[in-house]
Amino acid sequence: MQGSRLIVALDTASWEQALKWVDRLPQVLWWKVGLELFTAVGPQILQALKERGKRIFLDLKLHDIPHTVGRAAQVAVGYGVDLLTVHAAGGSAMLRAAVAATQGSSCRLLAVTLLTSLGPDQVRQELGVERDPGDYVLQLARLALDQGVSGLVCSPQEVGRLRQALGPEVLLVTPGIRLGDPEAEDDQRRVCTPAAALRAGADYLVVGRPITAAADPVSAWQRFQAVEEAIG
């Protein structure tokens, strides 16, 4: 995969707003379409991005019975998306069904380990996982890779450990990126700066509101791009 390592998230339910961002930032190659936008406007947003020559990260985090996930992944492949997500917690059979659906295509399958909105207390108290979140993430990562996925979506806090444990070939995509204060209040808990994530071994960074909600999205993107270029 070539081009910038920044993926900008189209976090909106509005067709008009999504394309306004895309057209205002023509230098951005990679765009993420998540559940909100895909549910609101359907697959035509993918066609609009393809017509503009963009690469597409379809982040639907598929999590269902194996047959359903396999069929959904097959449909996504037909849209020409470049990256597609499934939940690693869906289990080995579900993961294998998704892998089988994407084989022979240019779509690379990514497994989501643990949502960046979940902090250690929630992982323990609500999910009933008494282990360190990093250990849990590594277990899910190995499960997914054993079934044949191409890479992982993981928080910046886990990316260094995963890179060290899993080697250089695994594609690591990291959301939860904040250019300024990583402790700034929002609904993501496990976040950090782009420089730290890239140095830890992330291949791609997913950035949404710090760019799209900025007073000047172009300047905000340029600041992120400058960090990427400085790291190399």
Curated annotation (Swiss-Prot):
Any Gene Ontology CC annotation: cytosol
GO biological process: 'de novo' pyrimidine nucleobase biosynthetic process; 'de novo' UMP biosynthetic process
NCBIfam families hit by this protein: PRK00230.1, pyrF
Active-site positions on this chain: K61 (proton donor)
Reported function: Catalyzes the decarboxylation of orotidine 5'-monophosphate (OMP) to uridine 5'-monophosphate (UMP).
Recorded GO MF terms: orotidine-5'-phosphate decarboxylase activity
Cross-referenced SMART domains: OMPdecase
Transmembrane segments: none
Signal peptide: none
Entry keyword set: Decarboxylase, Lyase, Pyrimidine biosynthesis
Gene: pyrF
Domain of life: Bacteria
Main EC class the enzyme belongs to: lyase
Known partners and oligomeric status: Homodimer.
Database matches in Pfam families: OMPdecase
Pathway participation: Pyrimidine metabolism; UMP biosynthesis via de novo pathway; UMP from orotate: step 2/2
Entry protein name: Orotidine 5'-phosphate decarboxylase
Catalysed reaction equations from the record: orotidine 5'-phosphate + H(+) = UMP + CO2
Record: residues binding substrate: 11, 32, 59-68, 116, 178, 188, 208-209
Family stated for the protein in its record: Belongs to the OMP decarboxylase family. Type 1 subfamily.
InterPro entries in alphabetical order: Aldolase_TIM, OMPdecase, OMPdecase_AS, OMPdecase_bac, OMPdeCOase_dom, RibuloseP-bd_barrel
Record-listed E.C. numbers: 4.1.1.23
The keyword DNA repair is assigned to this record: no
